[in-house]
Amino acid sequence: MKNIIRFASLALSVITLLCAVSCGGTEKPAVTTEPTTTEAPASTEPPAPTELVIGENGKSQYTIVYAANEEYGHDTAFYLHRYFREQLKISIDYVKDSERPAEKAEAFEIVVGRTDRDASTAFRKKLKSGEFYIGVEGSSLYIVGRGEEETRAAVEYFIDYIAGTEQKSCKIPADLAFDSGEELSPVLEWEKSKILLSAGGYARMTTLKNGELAVGYSNGGIKFAISTNDGKGWTNTVTVTKPAKTPLGDTLTYANANVIQYGDGDIMVAYRAHSPTNSTKNFYTSIRYQISKDGGKTFGDPVIVVEYQRNDTDFKGFWEPHMVILPDGRLAMYYANDCIGPQDADYPYVPSGSYQHIMVHVFDYETETFDKGTIASNGVDHKSRDGMPVVCNLSDGGLVMVIEANWDKNYAFIIQMLFSEDGINWSDPVTVISPTKKGHYAGAPYVALLPDGRLAVSCQATQYSGATMSSDLVQNSQMNVYISKEPITLANCKDVNEKSFVKVMENPLSMGVETRSIWPAMHVHNGYLICVADIGTNLSTGVTGIYIRRAPIDTIK
């Protein structure tokens, strides 16, 4: 064995010598006494991840953690959980923070709201009212709002703009740090309280000449009420309508109240009156109004603007009257008309239920009656059910109208805008709001002029509702508010499109992820943008009531 080792050593020496000769000739190699250094090998540690894999192949190692002490914490977490499960097809669990204490918590959490996690507290301290933060800390994702409603808005934003739509997969940037206060505008500082106006529904407001706020709504008939403290409380409630029968003998149903004051102070309340929805007789439909000459204490007899009696029970007719003072001082009434009738009549009935017109009638102050009317927006020409018109004045003397329309087959309904110099002749409609997802719904629009010339637009929309989608889109809707980026006038109205408006991320009248806020309206009054809507439980017909929420105008930025 020793001989083998010696032979191997000798062979190695010969090979080394031959290599030295072949590489360096016969010269002796240089000898140095300096210490030799060897560079450290390159690091073999993997690079920092560029993304967080929330879910892959339909599975996730993450857990949604919500705040046990938040009223709607469970609902919001369940909303996110359901999105992962139903839309992305990713299995993910959710628990409250008390079930997964911070000191025992592991990584891989999606932390929602005001939990006991230190990072949640740190993020919330940096936020103002109406703001939220979505960001990564370590291997966990934090979705945190200043309050519960802001957290809900953050979850909606995460779903719509960050989570993606690829099924069985969800990956987000590892350096995600989104602050809505820095990235999004406008921001409205909604007042904390939501004010109960009444039971009932479909409320519409106006400011009277004496500075009081007036409202019309339906609740066992058409009601009229006054507020002397900017909507905080309501008094002097009057029932405008009286029980009556249709020409067919059915009990009249009243809805869609609208209020305006004109001239020397007369107050007009308009509404629709029609057969009940369960009528087994022919269908009767009408638009009516009543006038008060004593400040809303009493109202005169109803006057019919338009009426029709159909030969079947199809629920088609006249809907949602809205009134405005035109630039020339006249009073105009707009309403939706999907009344199917003879095409050779002197009134523009629609040929089928696939279409709906917007009508306009002008009021004669002397006779206190409206004219025969004309089409303001032609649903047949637009191949659409143009509906639910609301009109307001622009800062330069023009007029703007918002409608819901269904010509775009990608969506159930979208919101469109038209412009006019006189309130009679209107431009072609342009789309200003469409849902973020195909098949979804944005309807029942409203528009209000802000003091700086910008427009506030609201609608009810399913893309920001937490309800499980069903065939009834209305019952799955939440009130959304949008603000135009710049003042809108007749001079620049041709440039208006969807990019002209930015959504206020916090929905004003949400009472938890499984509630609806529908038939919304807005009104600018005494320094406030006041929102009103019917609030109830999603997927049911029971309405909790009509609620109001205010935002000081000077908080809009």
Which positions does each model-derived feature cover?
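N-terminal secretory signal peptides that target proteins for export/translocation
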Residues: 1-3
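Sec-dependent N-terminal signal peptides of Gram-positive bacterial secreted proteins and lipoproteins
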Residues: 5-25
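Intrinsically disordered, low-complexity Ser/Thr- and Pro-rich stretches
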Residues: 10, 32-33, 39, 45, ...
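Short Gly/charged-rich anion-binding patches and loops
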Residues: 11, 79, 287
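Secreted/extracellular small peptides and ectodomain modules produced from precursors
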Residues: 17, 21, 168, 332-333, ...
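Sec-dependent signal peptide cleavage junction
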Residues: 18-38
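Solvent-exposed alpha-helical segments and adjacent loops
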Residues: 36-184
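Asp-box/BNR beta-propeller blade signature and adjacent active/binding-site loops
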Residues: 181-557
